[in-house]
A protein has these predicted regions:
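Aromatic "clamp/platform" in nucleotide-sugar-dependent glycosyltransferases that forms part
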Residues: 278
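Short hydrophobic beta-strand element within catalytic cores of glycosyltransferases
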Residues: 295-298
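C-terminal amphipathic helix plus adjacent low-complexity
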Residues: 353, 358-426
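Conserved acidic donor-binding segment of nucleotide-sugar-dependent glycosyltransferases
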Residues: 310-311, 315-322, 331-337
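Conserved donor-binding/catalytic core segment of Leloir-type glycosyltransferases
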Residues: 151, 183-201, 207-212, 221-223
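Membrane-proximal helix-turn-helix segments that form the acceptor-binding/catalytic region
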Residues: 117, 130-150
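Nucleotide-activated donor-binding/catalytic signature segment of Leloir-type glycosyltransferases, i.e.
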Residues: 234-261
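A short, well-ordered alpha-helix in the C-terminal region of glycosyltransferases
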Residues: 338-354, 363-366
Length: 426
């Protein structure tokens, strides 16, 4: 919904109505709760529908996460009446939500690549999910390659999916409407990161850079919730505290999530804003930071780095390079206040012009019309064969846990005991 909010007024001015179904493998509601939100018809995935499709995918009992993603994708496609009332369908890559419309090929389709489950599993692997991740990589590559039109938000992600699929992938950045900023705040004298404490968001790169700076290292506030690090029940914050005890909790201070208004106030008061991600399809907080008027440092691993000209409207450093980040921090700490203000103002002008909603809306509408025209000229047929079979429900099994027969009983009992113990003492 957030992605479309800034575009809807321009869509409606062209007579385009937008309907959105919100949902995923982990998000559904008892009822669809239809509502009109800022001119968009919004529904929520129905839990009973998700559960019904989950039961039909029992061939993936050994891969419950994949099973739930496919179930959610088909449940949402069914709830949308398989796209029958729509001129064009836009489906997200995350959670395999694009798979049903891609393989059914019954409506014009644009796949919007915001960051797929398979991509995330590469940049943030979790113990025990390796088999699911490998399967997701294969399915995403094959099914995105079969989609009619493919879009994403940054040049780097377009290049990634083009290399994986051999298809043309267009890059259209998100739209941005500048909001009124709060009254000017005195500089906090501290750096600021907005985002989850997560491996691919780059907290370890920041810690390493600050460690290299020693006594010159600035204080940095990190605003965002904790996530797992490498294993379920783990903590990224705990990992960083153990790996960098002199930095995490001393030089980098974690804060819980705050409101968007508080984010804007913090960004406007920061000495600098930082996006240290080792990978990010785009990272919208970079745009918000640039709009604040304060200098913004962005890793080349984040797609939003497309907007930055180093030293002109912000600062860049190579993805994962702590030494380079330390050099940029040193550069900012020794730069004049006047120069930093000039760079911040240039960043504000960049996001106003490059992400102008009317301009972005025209590009997206042109892509929708191209998909509709292409579909009319070259109708597609549903995918069959192995790929089609893999992505659709299979014949029900009388014993969906039969895959456990391939494991030694001793291992099963040991794992069950350990899992029970963890639940008791949690």
């Amino acid at each position: 919904m957030t992605f479309y909010r800034t575009l809807v007024p321009f869509y409606r001015s062209q007579g385009i109505d937008v309907s959105v179904i919100e949902g995923s493998a982990s998000w559904a509601a008892e009822h669809s709760n239809p509502a009109e939100i800022e001119g968009v018809h919004v529904e929520v995935l129905e839990r009973a529908r998700l559960d019904a499709w989950y039961a039909r995918f029992d061939q993936y009992a050994a891969l419950p996460l994949l099973r739930r993603h496919l179930a959610a994708a088909w449940a949402m496609w069914e709830q949308a009446d398989f796209g029958r009332d729509f001129d064009v369908v836009e489906a997200c890559d995350w959670g395999l939500l694009f798979v049903p419309p891609a393989i059914e090929a019954s409506r014009p389709l644009v796949v919007q690549c915001h960051g797929s489950v398979g991509q995330i599993s590469v940049h943030d692997p979790v113990e025990g999910e390796e088999s699911c991740s490998i399967t997701l990589h294969l399915l995403e590559r094959a099914c995105i390659g079969a989609a009619q039109h493919i879009q994403t938000l940054s040049r780097a992600n377009a290049a990634f999916w083009s290399a994986e699929t051999g298809r043309e992938v267009s890059a259209i950045p998100p739209a941005w409407i500048g909001r009124s900023l709060p009254d000017s705040h005195p500089s906090s004298g501290r750096g600021l990161v907005i985002g989850r404490v997560q491996r691919w968001k780059g907290p370890q790169i920041l810690c390493e850079a600050l460690k290299r700076l020693g006594d010159r290292a600035p204080m940095v506030d990190w605003v965002g919730r904790d996530t797992v690090w490498g294993a379920q029940q783990s903590s990224s914050a705990a990992h960083l505290s153990a790996a960098y005890p002199e930095i995490w909790g001393r030089k980098v201070i974690q804060h819980p999530q705050v409101t968007s208004a508080e984010v804007a106030a913090r960004q406007q008061a920061a000495l600098f804003n930082l996006v240290p991600s080792t990978w990010d399809v785009f990272n919208f907080t970079a745009v918000e930071a640039m709009a604040s008027g304060r200098p913004t440092i962005v890793s080349t691993g984040a797609g939003a780095s497309d907007l930055i000209e180093d030293g002109v409207n912000g600062f860049l450093f190579p993805s994962g390079d702590a030494e380079a980040l330390a050099s940029v921090l040193d550069r900012i700490l020794t730069e004049s206040a006047e120069k930093l203000t000039e760079i911040g103002r240039a960043a504000q002008e960049t996001v106003r012009s490059a992400l102008n909603p009317e301009k972005i809306a025209k590009q997206r509408i042109a892509a929708y019309r191209a998909a509709i025209h292409d579909f009319a000229q070259r109708p597609r047929v549903p995918l069959s064969g192995w790929l089609g079979d893999i992505c659709r429900p299979a014949q029900s099994s009388s014993n969906e846990m039969a895959f456990l027969e391939g494991f030694p009983l001793r291992q099963i009992v040991k794992h069950a005991a350990q899992r029970t113990s963890r639940r008791i003492w949690r």
